Each structure stands twice: as C-alpha cells, then as structure tokens.
Amino acid sequence: MDDELTLLPREKMLSFGITSLTDAELLALFLRTGTSGKSVFVLAQELLQHFGSLHGLLNANLDEFRYVEGIGLAKYAQLKGIAELARRYHSVRVLGDNPLLSPEMTKDFLQSQLSDAEREVFMVIFLDNQHRVVKHSRMFSGTLRHVEVHPREIVREAIKVNAAAVILAHNHPSGCAEPSKADKDITERIIKCCQFMDIHVLDHFIIGRGEYVSFAEQGWI
C-alpha cells in the first residue's frame, strides 16, 4: 500500500489498475500538465474542491471556469472533451443488441445525455419488443423552467421506427429532480396517446444534478 501512495497516477494505474485511482488522480491523468507554480495533481484537487465533484466539474460552463485561477481555454477544452467522450460512450453502449436491463443502467445513460443541459430537454428512448434500443432522440427543447411536449409526435416517431415501447426523460436545470404536477400530467397524456397504438411507456425519468426520479420506481407507471 505504501508503494501505491507514492506512485504518480500513470504508474499507479499501470501497477494497480485504473480503478485504483482517486478522482483527483484520474483527472490529473487527463490534464497531464499543471500551471505555473502548481503541479497537475494540485490543480486537479483544487478543481474538484471548487466544483464539488467530477460531475460538477465536467458540467461547468465557460463562465464558471473564468473564476478558477490557472484554467485557460486549453484546459477547459480538455475537460469538455472528456465529458463529451463519456456521453458518446454511453450513447453507443445502449444501441445494438444489448437491452436496457435495469433502471440503474438507464439512469446512467440518461444522466450522461441530459445532466449538462442548461435548458429543459425532453428525450425519448425507443425500444423494440425485447427492450433493445432502436433509437434515442432529444425530441423537444425548452426554457430554464419549461419544455413543451407533443405526445402525438412521440407516437408518430415510435411508429416510424417500429418501437414497441418507450422510455421518457427530461432534465431539471435547477438540479432538483422532484417532479411537478405538469410533469405528471404530461406523462399521463403520453401514456394515453401511446395506448391507442399499443405502445408501452415503461418509465419517465427526471434528471437533476446528481439525482434522479424514476416514475416506475415510485409506482406512478
């Protein structure tokens, strides 16, 4: 264990595996260099402390970075690149022959797609009769507090891609995932619309900042 503590992140990863790295060490591995008078590891620690977590760091916008000493456009671009790489990884992972097996797996995917959105976005995952993803789409975009959703357009797209079921999702830019009455009402409208075409609504996820609510887990669907 003493040897592990004295190793640099890259050497530690090669010796003990990538999962042995702390968040700060993993971040330092990507940033590669520090700033004048500050090592990359110290920079990584300060970034995590400033933004509270990896999630907060990777979802921060350029204006928020302007207040962090030593972070220029190059470092900002690196961090946004990491976040986008993770988002695309999750996007590719759910397509193909692997079904969405659990709410946890679905939640991880949706957080990668929606948690950094600065306005409300309504997303739909279209699935076949074996719950394999045939398509996912950001169907509607709105304001900071509201997104207008059209159930018939969801049904039309589901028929177009021959989907047997859908999973609904939208984000709350405020960070609080608690559903509003409007969220519950639109879910009911979509369910009724889909029932006419024998399309099942499996769940509706609300994605906040580091939290989520699943309508299915709550027994609302």
UniProtKB/Swiss-Prot annotation:
Residue positions binding Zn(2+): H170, H172, D183
PANTHER family listed in its UniProt record: DNA REPAIR PROTEIN RADC (PTHR30471), UPF0758 PROTEIN YEES-RELATED (PTHR30471:SF3)
Domain of life (superkingdom): Bacteria
Name of this chain's protein: UPF0758 protein Ent638_0101
Keyword Hydrolase: yes
GO molecular function: metal ion binding; metallopeptidase activity
Sequence motif JAMM motif, residues: 170-183
NCBIfam families noted in UniProt: PRK00024.1, radc
Domain (MPN) ranges: 99-221
Species this chain originates from: Enterobacter sp. (strain 638)
Sequence similarity: Belongs to the UPF0758 family. YicR subfamily.
Keyword Protease listed: yes
GO biological process: proteolysis
Pfam family, any one: RadC
Sorted UniProt keywords: Hydrolase, Metal-binding, Metalloprotease, Protease, Zinc
UniProt cross-references to SUPFAM superfamilies, sorted A to Z: RuvA domain 2-like
